A protein has these predicted regions:
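Hydrophobic alpha-helical connector segments
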Residues: 82-114, 134-137, 141-143, 163-167, ...
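Helix-turn-helix
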Residues: 22, 30-64, 68
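Short coil/turn segments at alpha/beta junctions that flank glycine-rich nucleotide-binding fingerprints
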Residues: 33-37, 87-88, 109, 154
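Amphipathic alpha-helical segments used for helix-helix packing
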Residues: 94, 108-131, 181-188
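C-terminal peripheral helix-coil segments that are non-catalytic and often amphipathic
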Residues: 1-7, 101-104, 108, 138-154, ...
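Short hydrophobic clusters on alpha-helical segments that form packing/core surfaces
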Residues: 23-31, 102, 209
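Generic hydrophobic, amphipathic alpha-helix propensity
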Residues: 19-27, 44, 69-73, 77, ...
């Protein structure tokens, strides 16, 4: 019996997906360790265990590969955020959950922070060129806007809060602390990355954000 003609194309597709996935994972580690300028295509190929020519075949050049890594990086965090099901929670709990998730995700994925640092060094031109990156972030803004509006209607949250500004504040409170933990620990003479310090930071961030959002009771 002749082989099914659909088998070979399906195998090739699976092989291509595996190869691209391996290259993206290797590139993520290389860019996180060396930045865009210091990353080397031969090291990426070596990390992935694949021929360097496949990088150019699938991605074109180093800039396009870096853009693909950034897109994947945002896709991963946005997919994790979806599992929070923020719209199923009461507004205050939804905000607390998002603050905690952001903090814990950054702790678990230090490469996320270093990749963003590298992207910012290049004025985020790779993200400016990526429609996909903007599409990935839009649902988060819409979800946060819905949480804020529900809280406003319930008389819990103040009105007029920009969901983008709020998310920047949530992310920034974690990002600055973790990106600068070594220098901050040195200049203040205390280890800001102990378990106790991390727990205190999380509580502080949640109170800062909710302190801004919560509607003051009438006098």
């Amino acid at each position: 019996m002749p082989p099914d003609s659909t088998v070979v194309p399906e195998v090739r597709i699976r092989d291509a997906d595996r190869s691209q996935g391996a290259l993206l994972a290797a590139a993520r580690d290389e860019f996180a360790e060396h930045g865009l300028g210091g990353a080397r295509m031969d090291r990426i190929a070596l990390r992935a265990g694949l021929n360097k020519r496949l990088i150019y075949y699938y991605f074109g050049d180093k800039d396009a590969l870096f853009q693909a890594v950034l897109e994947q990086t945002y896709r991963e965090i946005r997919e994790e955020e979806k599992t929070l099901r923020l719209l199923d929670l009461e507004p205050v709990e939804a905000v607390r959950r998002l603050v905690a998730f952001t903090w814990q995700y950054y702790l678990a994925h230090p490469e996320f922070l270093t990749l963003l640092n590298s992207a910012n060094l290049h004025r985020a031109r790779h993200l400016h060129e990526s429609r996909r990156a903007r599409e990935l972030n839009s649902p988060l803004v819409e979800t946060l806007a819905a949480v804020l509006e529900r809280g406003r209607r319930q008389g819990i949250f103040r009105g007029g809060v920009d969901p983008v500004q709020l998310y920047v504040s949530i992310a920034g409170l974690s990002y600055f602390y973790l990106s600068n933990s070594h220098t901050l620990s040195a200049i203040f003479g205390r280890d800001l990355m102990t378990a106790k310090a991390r727990n205190e930071r999380l509580s502080h961030m949640a109170e800062v954000i909710l302190g801004y959002l919560l509607q003051e009771p009438p006098a």
